[in-house]
Amino acid sequence: MNKYHNKKTVNGSIAFDSQKEAQRYTELSLLEKAGVITKLELQKPFELIPKQKGERAVKYIADFYYFDNEKNCFVAEDVKGMKTQVYIVKRKLFKYRYPDILFMEV
């Protein structure tokens, strides 16, 4: 367990940070097999602020990223337990920088 009481879990050959995230992967995999979603990716990075001289880029890593065929748009999903201040700022930057991608917290 980590400081947020999440238990790392393995689903198939994939390690997840929490049981909730592993369960969501199972759900999304079934939706992908049914054709409801396509192009499912795990841990997809998005650049929020480019690197600058002497500074690294700021990135947000979505737990899941896929195309929702019913909503006709790309979706970035974050499986959340504890919402830290850093997460809240990155979520706001993501929504500003990528307005065409639907952001969902599960």
What residue ranges belong to the model's regions?
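Electrostatic, structured charged patches in enzyme active sites and in nucleic-acid/phosphate-binding
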Residues: 1-106
